[in-house]
């Protein structure tokens, strides 16, 4: 079955998006651009279209483990040419939040280079004795020992920050627990509620729009998650595209009170629709 601009396949949602009229695109990465180390179909064509049409674009990812340079290099290994200024991560959003809220604060951080470097660059010091904050991101450094350490520091008064509220993330052969799942034991043990800085936090979305130099009505949010990507775009006043190349299915959508503007199989469909071509339903 073919989907065209007159198809009823999207009739239950807000309607078609004129992608040619949009100035900016904010895109998730995991499940949208790649799975693990495998680039998804249509991505190269989508990025080339963004360049050819002089669109402003930003990869806004809740993955706190990588720096923008590492993300650029990761895409380069997949044959995709995207420079560092096109990335904004939940690690950078977390560091910006702490820099603005508590300049010169100290933290006990659980995470990878992306989070640690962002914190250092924001003038935040590491402290495993009496930190102002415990900051949790994704990463291989998460263990029972670090969990116990973080729990006790929060129990003694440190405030709890999560880089993002993703419960899981897609990998090539399934899913992996993400930041929200890693923060949950600390919350449960201490009775403390964490503050999450990544999507769908509006602070991160506003920063993304500023980086694009776009008004929300001129931009599109593209992601594979209803609970972070679609809701963050919707609440920011953007058009939203849910792609089915990641963790969501059409059945997933039915469990939410809100809807994306469009549902597509992948980002390659954006190019096809912009060119007036047919896409697979």
List where the protein language model places each region.
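Asp-based, Mg2+/Mn2+-dependent phosphohydrolase catalytic module
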Residues: 2-55, 64-88, 95-281
């Amino acid at each position: 079955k073919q989907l065209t601009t007159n198809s009823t396949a999207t009739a239950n949602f807000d309607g078609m998006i004129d992608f040619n009229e949009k100035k900016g695109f904010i895109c998730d990465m995991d499940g949208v651009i790649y799975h693990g180390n495998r680039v998804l179909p249509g991505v190269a064509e989508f990025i080339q279209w963004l360049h050819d049409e002089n669109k402003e674009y930003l990869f806004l990812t809740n993955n706190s483990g990588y720096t923008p340079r590492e993300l650029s290099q990761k895409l380069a290994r997949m044959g995709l040419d995207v420079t560092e200024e096109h990335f904004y991560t939940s690690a950078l959003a977390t560091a910006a939040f702490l820099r603005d809220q508590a300049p010169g604060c100290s933290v006990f951080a659980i995470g990878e280079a992306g989070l640690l470097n962002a914190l250092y660059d924001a003038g935040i010091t590491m402290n495993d004795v009496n930190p102002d904050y415990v900051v949790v991101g994704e990463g291989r450094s998460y263990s029972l020992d670090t969990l116990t350490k973080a729990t006790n520091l929060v129990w003694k008064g440190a405030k709890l920050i999560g880089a993002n509220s993703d419960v899981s993330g897609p990998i090539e052969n399934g899913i992996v627990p993400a930041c929200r799942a890693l923060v949950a034991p600390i919350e449960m043990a201490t009775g403390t509620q964490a503050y999450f800085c990544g999507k769908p936090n509006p602070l991160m979305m506003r920063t993304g729009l500023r980086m694009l130099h776009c008004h929300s009505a001129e931009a599109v949010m593209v992601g594979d998650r209803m609970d972070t990507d679609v809701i963050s775009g919707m609440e920011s006043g953007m058009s939203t595209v849910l792609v089915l190349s990641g963790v969501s299915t059409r059945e997933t959508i039915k469990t939410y009170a809100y809807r994306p503007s469009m549902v597509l199989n992948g980002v390659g469909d954006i190019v096809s629709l912009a060119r007036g071509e047919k896409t697979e339903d």
